[in-house]
Amino acid sequence: MKKWTRICAAGILAFVLSACGQTAVPKENPITGEKEEVVVKSELTAGEVMKKANAAAETQQSMHSDMEILQTLEMGDEKQEITSTIDMDMILEPLAMRQTMNMQVGGEEMAIEQYMTEEGFFMKDPQSGRWVKLPNDMYKEVTGQMAGVTESPVDFSMYKEYAKDFIFEETHDEYVLTLEGSGEKFSELMKEMLGKNMPLGTDEAMPVEADMKVEKINLQFSIDKKTFFTKDFDMDMIMTMDEQGQKIKVTQNVTGTMTKINEVDEIKIPKEIIDNAQKMDSRTNQQ
């Protein structure tokens, strides 16, 4: 079950928008059914918005992100519910990150704090409360994995065949792209997303080839009309997977917001953490 939890988490930040050829229609209020008033209607097509969003993503060097993830994993009689919140600052060059993640698994709570800069990879042990400095080889491995994830939002090539499936709407200050789907077509999309974001050479990468079926997937992205940066996303998904004769059902909701884009200038590890962190070598990590 832990392996599948990691697989689900690996794809959280990999979902990006695609586009079709029509211009946007005013967004409909899901409760009242009324169309939102748009003062100046955009003449851009969804494809043009996608190209501009792609170009904007290439200029993105830093951001703050808040996410909430609700997951239920079922395998036979075993059921696991996981609730996670993530608060993160990230700079792409040189790659640096500050992250706080709170998880509730099976009634137990766990908080994980991390810093990663050129000074090293530091993590607060959720059990002891002490800071540890992880081995340099682990730092290199994690930065390599993160580099792949941070590059994925500007790779729109794998979404082209799903273009006609997106609903394209607009509000006064946002473009909204929504995808609702199910079946084999979207199962292949999920496999490609997970494959791009799983570390190569790990056991966790193998189940991506398992029999995966998307029963339901709803994605929604909001894009700022002025900057063309993606502001937030919402994903609901139900999928089943078979591995070695065992059926696993995953129900997942992920919501995320991206703010302070290109405004995070520095991520600095507090001096007391650097001075007092226990160094963990590869040997210690295996124990």
Which positions does each model-derived feature cover?
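Bacterial N-terminal signal peptides that target proteins for export
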Residues: 1-8
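Short hydrophobic/aromatic segments of transmembrane alpha-helices and their interfaces
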Residues: 8-9, 212
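C-terminal motif of bacterial Sec signal peptides marking the signal peptidase cleavage site
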Residues: 16-19
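Subset-of-secretome marker
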Residues: 21-287
